[in-house]
Amino acid sequence: VCLSMKATAVPFRRRWESFPCNDFAWARRRLACLRKGARYCYLHETKGADMALVFDVVKAKGKPDDNRRPGTSCPFCDVDGLENIIRRDGDRIWLQNKFRTLRQTMQTVLIESADHDADITTYDPEELHGVIRFALSCWEQMIDSGDYRSVLMYKNMGPLSGGSLTHPHMQIVGLEEEDGYAEISMKHFEGVDVWKRGRVRVTISIDPVVGFFEVNVICPQGLAHGDAPEDIEDTNRFADALQAVVRYVLNEHHGGRASSYNLFFYHIEGMTIVKALPRWVVSPYFVGYRLAQCNAETTLTHDAERLRELLDAHA
């Protein structure tokens, strides 16, 4: 029998289309229960992911880690040794993750550059635009496959980000059964209006996902696929704004104390959004109670004014 927290037993004789969880994940769960000969399948009733992602620690054995084992060879620098490459565009390589530690997922890695010490903050405009356009295209390709309930794209950078390798890369992960967007809505991206140019705008969240300082770069979905001059211009502007935001997060926000950051990409309500945030030790309010925190108005105003100056100068 399939089990999940706060679940209700649902007999199979009812039509599955009438169940509250009318989606691909429920169909897969129902089929799995039938194969096991179960008379009932347990249906999750609360909003959010159907269950926690399952991490298989055995599959993480031998995984390189620049934070715990510095000085070890970088697998992304050994291009000739890379396997299961999905797409390539010059130095940019999208491939399956060798260490697929999460069950019922497809974990992939997008290597941004051949330069081990590069980062979004250091790319010249041509390389920056190429990286962002390639990443958005690979993300869309995985979504368009229809093989996953949701597809997540994100970037870890630094020892507190959750990442293990320094070499610049992103991750694109297809979730077979979970809705990675279940707890996310537009409220997490609205707040202080910092900057707008063309169809690209930047905000600071006042209802952040985690806190304390989350900056959002927002543009209409699908721009990266457009060939019209205005689409190319705004896609490049999206990348330029992101670079300026990350530079601010690392070099100026909170006195430039941050050594780590995350980027999280979303498609929501017809928009493509990337959320950038510095990473610190996670607050116990969030760990224990899922309570996010937001900086006070004076701090938000200061950040918005200074960030606006940088965006006007560089994006």
Please give the residue ranges for each predicted region.
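Low-acidity, Ser/Thr- and Arg-rich intrinsically disordered low-complexity segments
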Residues: 2-4, 14
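Intrinsic, low-complexity polybasic segments
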Residues: 5-7, 29-31
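Charged/polar low-complexity intrinsically disordered segments
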Residues: 6, 17-19
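Active-site microenvironments that recognize anionic phosphate/pyrophosphate groups
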Residues: 37-161, 165, 173-237, 246-315
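Conserved, mostly hydrophobic/aromatic
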Residues: 169
